[in-house]
Structure formats: structure tokens, C-alpha cells
Regions:
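An acidic, low-aromatic, low-complexity terminal/linker signal
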Residues: 1-166
Length: 166
């Protein structure tokens, strides 16, 4: 008799404009409150700027703006989900993030044809654990890494300039 094991993955769960999203926890380094964002001139609209986190300057991407939602002021609930994607550390600004959950593979469905266009490529799957619906993001598609090197170079110059002025 063969026993079938139900494999599950762990996800960081966050909300954005009233919708629940998940990212694979192995891509997340930490979740933190946002104290200060330094704007970077000529950055793409979704790049809020850079933040200093654990001794590093990292780009901060506003997922509301990236997904075409209304930009809202940051508040006490706003979090930054710090990710490591292809060797680059990037902060994702979300409305709220406080939860790690394990989701069985059998409750994650591939996105169907109803989810199409640009937003469709951002969605890796749709999870339905219990009575919840969680959109699982494909971070490689969500974060356009071609924008990030410019931001990293600009932020390094700004940090050097600030240090030289001291």
C-alpha cells in the first residue's frame, strides 16, 4: 500500500488594497516597520527610494504602485517585506504583513485564463486554505530587476556623499 504525502510550502502572507497575497518564505529575509525612506531622483514610479536596513542600503518597491493601486500614506500598519531575489536584497512595501503559514500543495491552483494580461504573469498560483483566497506571487515577474541596478548605483553614491559630508 503506497502512502501519498501531502507536501506543503511556507509563505509570508500580506495584504495590499484589501487583497491577500503570499510569497515563498525562502525568498523572505525579514519583515519590518518602515522608519525612513530616502527618495532617489529619476527612479521608476514604483521605487519609493532606498532604506537602511541591518547595515545595508536597499531599494524599496511600493507594491501598491507596482500593481496600479492608489498610493496611500505609510502608517503604523505598513510593513516592508525584505526579500532576496537572484542575489539582490529588495524591500517590498505592503499594507500589512504579520503571518507565516504553511499551505498544502493541493490547495494551490495555477491561475486560470480569467487572470490574463500583465497582472496574470505576476500570479504564480491561487491558494484556498480554509475559506481564504491567497494570490501567490511570482516575485521574478513582480520585480523588474533591470530597474534595480540603477537604484543601487544611485543609492551607493548618495551614501558616499552623505558620509563625505560628515
Amino acid at each position: 500500500m503506497s502512502e501519498q504525502q501531502n507536501h506543503s510550502d511556507t509563505f509570508v502572507i500580506f495584504t495590499l488594497a484589501g487583497t491577500t497575497y503570499g510569497v515563498h518564505s525562502n525568498l523572505v529575509q525579514q519583515m519590518e516597520m518602515i522608519e525612513h525612506i530616502t527618495p532617489v531622483p529619476n527612479a521608476p514610479p514604483a521605487i519609493e527610494g532606498v532604506v537602511f536596513s541591518r547595515g545595508r542600503v536597499i531599494p524599496a518597491v511600493n507594491l501598491r504602485v507596482r500593481f496600479g493601486f492608489e498610493r496611500i500614506p505609510l502608517d503604523i500598519q505598513t510593513r516592508m517585506v525584505v526579500t532576496n531575489l537572484d542575489g539582490r536584497t529588495i524591500g517590498l512595501i505592503v499594507d500589512n504583513a504579520r503571518e507565516f503559514i504553511s499551505i498544502p500543495e493541493d490547495v494551490i491552483q495555477p491561475p486560470n485564463e480569467a487572470i490574463s494580461g500583465l497582472s496574470g504573469k505576476y500570479i504564480e498560483g491561487i491558494a484556498t486554505p480554509g475559506d481564504r483566497i491567497i494570490l501567490i506571487l511570482n516575485l521574478t515577474e513582480v520585480i523588474n530587476l533591470t530597474d534595480i541596478p540603477v537604484i543601487e548605483q544611485q543609492s551607493e553614491k548618495e551614501v558616499r556623499s552623505e558620509n563625505a559630508a560628515r
